[in-house]
Amino acid sequence: LPAFAGHVPRELSRIFPKAKITRLEAWSGYPDEYACSFLDPMDSLFTVVQKKFIETETKLYGTDHVYGIDLFNELMPPSWEPEYLGRVSRQVYEALEKADKDAVWLQMTWLFWNERKYWTNDRVKPYITSFPADRQLLLDYYCERQEVWQRTNKYFGVPYIWCYLGNFGGNTMLVGDVKNVNKLLENTFKNGGKNFTGIGSTLEGFDCNPFMYSYVFEKAWDFKTHRDIPAWTRALADQRTGKADQN
């Protein structure tokens, strides 16, 4: 389930004038008038909103206790001080825990790659290690091109999922390097650390390039068998079109 990530309309400051609300930089070159406002997690109002948000959606949908929160995805935080980043993430988790004692915080790590100039390890580490590792799960978002676990000391022991993206913004295309994906997965199983938790996909659109997604997920279920890529390809063709005719 999604949870409250602190992004609020700027008009909220009229209702709560004492709340610590910061104006973040505009996203992706948009004019500043469209920039996002951010309710500081250290403000007590953040916990109030989070609790109400989770209570409401749990009544509607139930819960598996896993909550997606991406605070600064493609956004600059109010401060790059490591101490601040650590305090922010710790407070976000504590607000989650007050709303659901079994809460697990799920977040993608695309920000660590997309803003890699700023997300150095001295900032990444406090951001993801300031609360219990077993209460969070990271999605290594774009592993076929950039495995962030390799840049961040295996996420300093925090559980993560190796994810195949393969699709930005719902683009339709038939493309993918199966051999390289297999190589990367084999290496992750061997060297990714005990906190490597599973294989997933972060595709941004459905019904495109089923070949690659079939391979990734079949690899997850039957890891050793799918090392023979030509054999897997022939089997997939048989499943889709029937057996090849000897003639």
Describe the role of every protein-language-model region:
Residues 1-246:
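Catalytic-core regions of glycoside hydrolase
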